[in-house]
Amino acid sequence: ESPLVEGADVHLPNLPSEPYAYSEMVYPYLWLNDPALQLFGGFGDEIEITDAGATLGRVLFHDVQLSANNTVSCGTCHQQEFAFADSAPGSMGISGHALHRNTPGLFNLRYQRRLFWDLRVVGLANQVLQPIGHPDEMGMSLDALPDKLRALPYYPALFEQAYGDPFIDLDRITNALIQFLRSIRSTSSRYDEGLANGFASFTESELLGKSVFFRSDTRCNQCHSG
């Protein structure tokens, strides 16, 4: 039995002639040398981000073929216009019913060791395939996934560009997704700009809000750690 859903539309990815320079992305110096951030950062740094690898990861992330019925991709719930989260209280999986939890945003994952809202998983390597295989989310058999991708016309070449040969397995799927996810970065927020200049650019109201946020009796930052 073919792993492809019979009659399903297969849309070739629309990729630029030159891949995006994912490998040249870096975090600000202040981030990389902040003692507090180092308590969270660096998890997964052993995985090199390459232009071809992250490009493959992006294609995988947005491809509905990774779901059992070819209707849901990772990007269906993790929408770029909402910081790779979702505006709905509960996203829709392949069942068509709202899931129990809101989709979390995806950015600066170098600084997130524990994942999912209940923090039950440590590291992207242990997380990225779970939504794909979850029966209510994407519902895909992980055992069947490599064969399904091999049968699609565009994946062998993309895997060869990323890894030197067209072999497809779960380890490479995981690696490519991690490369793309770790390339999603937000480093130019109003707070980042303030951090770089000692918060000289903050208004009086913003400084008061920052003080309340980090105060020992409010402890907002204990959960909202960035």
Segments from the language model and where they lie:
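Periplasmic c-type cytochrome electron-transfer domains
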Residues: 1-226
